[in-house]
Amino acid sequence: MTGVQTCALPISLRAWNADLQIVVAFRMLPEVVWNMPRLGTFNLHASLLPQYRGAAPINWAVINGDTETGITTFFLKHEIDTGEVIQQVHVPIADTDNVGIVHDKLMMLGGRLVTETVDAILADTVKSVPQEEMAVVGELRPAPKIFKDTCRIDWNQPVKRIYDFIRGLSPYPAAWTELVQSDGTAVVLKIFETEKIEHLHESAPGTLQTDGKTYIRIAGTDGWIGVHALQLPGKKRLKTDELLRGFKLTGECRVH
């Protein structure tokens, strides 16, 4: 036995003699913990299970360009995020939403759904559904943990994919790219706010264009990404025109 199984948590929980346990954004629990209450243990998860099982469901829903996500309450079982579904709420994702906005939408609804789920369990009106019996449109997509390397922008893609990737990581942990200046020096550039400029061009992906004053745009495979908010190492997040007032960029710069 390791981790939470060997600590004092099971002993502390048993002392409460709880009828029901609720888990939100916590690590995987051993059966000795989640099987303790007579009415079970349920979890609040930020996706429409069985889609996006894993640590970063909100990020991946936005990164993949989904137009809808939601929250799910489900009973815990051995495999992570696979227990029987109790209730779900669907939430739209606007094309301009970043992960922070979607997170806040889900947070506003999460407390209410937890309360409704508790009431239903106590009233013995729950009819939970095994996830394998639920209708799913398309293939199941995972939501693995996001690391720094996950956040690097691949410019050799359509601008829609790049745009969704950036907003799916904004404001945290933030998508980034390496900016190579005309003298060959390179710095990491975090990008937070963008727009799609779907205009065919002959520039190589990663080509940077700027007037040095008001705009920066970077080439994808089928258009440009207009950059509106960004951050240099050791500096605060700035609007593009603010950054250009203090940092010299030329059209000879590239990103990759």
Regions found by a protein language model. Name each.
Residues 6, 35, 245:
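Phosphate-coordinating loops and pocket residues in cytosolic domains that bind phosphorylated ligands
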Residues 8-17:
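Short amphipathic alpha-helix with an adjacent loop that forms part of the alpha/beta core around
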